[in-house]
């Protein structure tokens, strides 16, 4: 689970990438393992690693992202800094998504 994700991140770092891409890195993990992977990614962000991350982990996105891009049906619906995206989204679809995700 989480250890495999961390090993995959470490292997990727061996290639000295300028950008790392993550596609739902926590989706298949047990809840207890999610924080381990997110902590590793937060560490990368703190070291200045550029990351493009597809995630439903809204707390992580709010904390780490410079920009949040919300997509629906393969289209960009909204793009904004986290402070604006989470506090005052423009698009109704974004508002609906956030109300459903952040209500729990």
Language model: regions and residue ranges:
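Conserved signature/switch motifs of ABC ATPase nucleotide-binding domains
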Residues: 15
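Catalytic Walker B motif of ABC-type/P-loop ATPase nucleotide-binding domains
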Residues: 20-23
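Helix N-cap at the start of a conserved alpha-helix in ABC-type nucleotide-binding domains
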Residues: 31-33
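Helical segment within the ABC ATPase nucleotide-binding domain
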Residues: 35-47
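H-loop/switch region of ABC-family ATPase nucleotide-binding domains
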Residues: 55-56
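A short, surface-exposed alpha-helical micro-motif characterized by mixed small hydrophobic
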Residues: 61-63
């Amino acid at each position: 689970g989480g250890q495999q994700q961390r090993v995959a991140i470490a292997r990727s770092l061996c290639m000295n990438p300028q950008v790392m891409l993550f596609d739902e890195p926590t989706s298949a993990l047990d809840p207890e393992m999610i924080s381990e992977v997110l902590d590793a990614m937060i560490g990368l962000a703190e070291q200045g690693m550029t990351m493009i991350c597809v995630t439903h982990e809204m707390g992580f996105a709010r904390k780490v992202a410079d920009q949040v891009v919300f997509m629906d049906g393969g289209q960009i619906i909204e793009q904004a800094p986290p402070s604006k995206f989470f506090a005052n989204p423009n698009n109704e679809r974004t508002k609906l998504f956030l109300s459903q995700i952040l209500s729990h």
